[in-house]
Every structure is written in C-alpha cells, then in structure tokens.
C-alpha cells in the first residue's frame, strides 16, 4: 500500500507535476524541508531556499492548496503538507562532444513530484501560537520581574568612592628588564676553543 492510496482520516487534496526538469535527488533535498509543515510555512521556506528545485516544488504545493480550496472547500489556513515525494521520471540521454573524437554521455533526469495536503484542525490555542512567540513572551515577563529586583539592591548598596587623582605627577609605565641569555654548554665551549679530544 503506497502513501497515495492510503486512506487518511482528514480531508485531503492531491497535486502532481510530471516530467519536471530537475533530478529526483535534488528535488528530495528540498522536499525534506517542508514535509509535515503547514502550507503557508512550506511556501515561506521554499521562497527563500537557494536550491533551483524549490521553485517547482512550491508550485506543486500551491496547486495542491488551490485544489483543496476549490474542489474540496477546505480552509487554506488549516492545510498541512501531509505527504510529498519525488519519483524518478524518464531520463533523456544527450551527448557532449569532447576532444579527439570522444563523446561523453549527459543524463538529463526528470521527476514526478506528488503533494498531498490535509486539512488538520488546530489542536488548541496554545499549539496554534508558535513556540518562538511563547518564548519571547516568557522572556519579556521574566525581564519585567527581574528588572525590579536589581534596582532595589542597587539602591541599598552605597556607591564606591574613587581615589583622588595625584596632583601634577605623571606616571610612566614600568620598563621591562632585558631578557637574559642562557649560559653556553661546556662541550660547545671546548669545541669552540679548538680542543680536539
């Protein structure tokens, strides 16, 4: 039983793009970024993805969302990319002429991209809000609570007084002593003096 024939419990819509001029391996690299995400998130990710395969994949996801809205009457805000995969299409074989009468084979690979979107209702209000938004709210609340406590401690502590500056005497930095040379070895000195033993 394949993913396309498997019955789902949520209403869904399908879109396919066949004979897309991108290799399946490169298409799968982009597809893995959006599997399981909402349609709006998936399209945002693909809009900024630098891979060339992101264009055709985004087009198929948008088509599946339009199919769900027009044919199934589903709410586009609840659509999730449930299943997405790229199968290998036919490979066109071409020849690249090379030096000395040789010819190299070029394989122009194609893909069949399939997208299934499902209308999944939001679980609750908490899950609808992104985790990033929850973290920022929590940090703002913590900073408000934390900001009042250090202010009280600072007010209780007396400020430290600085030592008065000396009158007119300018300090100069201390000079470093020159490095000492290591003493010469005894065997080297006897050889240098001409002692041959």
UniProtKB/Swiss-Prot annotation:
The keyword Ribosomal protein applies. Gene3D superfamilies: Ribosomal protein L22/L17. It holds the Pfam family Ribosomal_L22. One of its GO terms (biological process) is translation. Keywords: Ribonucleoprotein, Ribosomal protein, RNA-binding, rRNA-binding. One of its GO terms (cellular component) is cytosolic large ribosomal subunit. GO terms for molecular function: rRNA binding; structural constituent of ribosome. Residues 172-183 have a biased composition (Basic residues). Residues 118-197 are annotated as: Disordered. Residues 149-165, 184-197 have a biased composition (Low complexity). NCBIfam families: rplV_bact. This protein binds specifically to 23S rRNA; its binding is stimulated by other ribosomal proteins, e.g. L4, L17, and L20. It is important during the early stages of 50S assembly. It makes multiple contacts with different domains of the 23S rRNA in the assembled 50S subunit and ribosome. The globular domain of the protein is located near the polypeptide exit tunnel on the outside of the subunit, while an extended beta-hairpin is found that lines the wall of the exit tunnel in the center of the 70S ribosome. Belongs to the universal ribosomal protein uL22 family. Part of the 50S ribosomal subunit. This is Large ribosomal subunit protein uL22.
